[in-house]
A protein has these predicted regions:
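Bacterial N-terminal signal peptides
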Residues: 4-14
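Anionic N-terminal interaction surfaces
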Residues: 16-70
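Phosphoinositide-binding peripheral membrane targeting modules
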Residues: 61-110
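Acidic, Ser/Thr- and proline-rich intrinsically disordered linker/docking segments
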Residues: 98-157
């Protein structure tokens, strides 16, 4: 009985996670959702599905699926809640203290530093972390004036 219950819960969790990820994939290209979140679609230079965690002080990281939106002057992380994009983080480039690229095996993580907060993020492709796109976010930020700095140890799983 317990094995059946645990198996059912694991299956349900997997189905919910896959469903949320598909919803994020659709939200990435939805101009109307982006407009209602306060970003003009024409201003979005890059829109990608991602996972991120915003860590303050020594709190444990809590990753969430999100839409990464980059404009000329800022970056935005939006979660998808009840069919709407909700702002989890908005940072102007000039308010960033630095950015780092952390590697673990074949995957990369962008770490963005702003005051006492560190944001760790990965860009996703259709199946897993897209290291090339994650690294291109890092390069874009440094090319646009965000200072490079040493990364913290790997954040998250």
């Amino acid at each position: 009985m317990r094995v059946a219950l645990v198996s059912a819960l694991c299956l349900l969790t997997g189905v919910c996670a896959a469903s949320n990820y598909r919803d994020i994939q659709r939200a990435v290209s939805d101009d109307q959702l982006l407009q209602s979140a306060g970003v003009t679609p024409a201003d979005a230079q890059l829109r990608k599905p991602c996972s991120a965690a915003v860590v303050e002080s020594d709190d444990p990281p809590e990753f969430f699926d999100c839409v990464y939106v980059q404009t000329e002057k800022d970056l935005n992380l939006f979660s998808l809640e009840d069919g709407y994009l909700m702002s989890e983080l908005q940072l102007k480039l000039h308010n960033m203290d630095g950015v780092a690229l952390q590697h673990m095996g074949r995957v990369s993580q962008v770490q963005i530093f702003s005051h006492d907060r560190v944001t760790a993020l990965y860009i996703h492709d259709k199946s897993w972390i897209d290291t090339a796109q994650t690294e291109s976010v890092y390069r874009w930020l440094t090319d646009h004036g965000v200072p490079a700095r040493e990364p913290r140890s790997w954040i998250g799983p």
